[in-house]
Amino acid sequence: MNKQSEKLAKAIAYEAKKKKERDEDKRPAFHVTPTTGWCNDPNGFSRFGEEYHLFYQYYPYENKWGPMHWGHCRTKDFIKWEELPCALAPDMEYDGQGCFSGTAVEHEGKHILMYTSVLEKDLEDGTHMVRQTQSIAIGDGENYEKVTENPVITADCLPEGSSPVDFRDPKIWKEDGRFYALIGSKAEDGSGQLALFTSEDALHWNYEKMIDQCKNRYGKMWECPDFFALDGCQVLIVSPQFMRAEGLEFHNGNNSIYFTGDYEKETMTYTRGDARQVDYGMDFYAPQTVETTD
């Protein structure tokens, strides 16, 4: 997969130029940092082959937020990280305003990235349209190509009242021969909810149900969900916007919280307990987990 759009080629060339100019002695020795420019959410944290890949929200051209790309690096030991070329650029109509957050999974020797594609445009009636959809790119660990089926999931299949503007951050995983995706959504009252989808091929998806709804109990929009089994429990991590403080908890506004609960796979039913903070710092948001070989 060596196809590169003009925007992606431009980003990769800019990275190469800035790498020659930067002072390596001033870069962190262990922490992942962008090749150049801006980064925020970690994306696509996953095992592929014998290595672990980490992508991130990325704007290479300035030290501030801009149209989101996906930066890329990999490691074998989580100490030494190898920088790789920019993996995704906002180069299609459906993602022209950004390749927002997402996750990744290995399948049959290929690395599948699932991300939120953002479209904005002015309509003939004078209104401004924003749409967040979900898209797929498939690669070999270094080069990735967006599929012709994109966007593979839109908000059209969601329950009435669900926002097509706030529909993002897919968590993709594979289990028992099927693909699953858990995606953040906003209900009509502005509260967060999590939509569950299934697929046989990661390209054609079926909406199953809202697996959880916060009903304004824990903030508003739930961003960047993570969902995994741990020590006999099913853990759900979300990053709610506009959390209200409760006693000594949730004082950082936009938090990352986790629930432990039970998940019934046959009925796709999740029963959760109370929320706990993942971290009490002011700058901790949108974490991702990966299952290692040990």
PLM region descriptions:
Residues P170-K171, C224-F227, A286-E291:
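Beta-rich, blade/repeat-based domains predominating
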Residues M1-D169, K174-G219, A229-G281, D294:
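Beta-rich carbohydrate-recognition and catalytic domains
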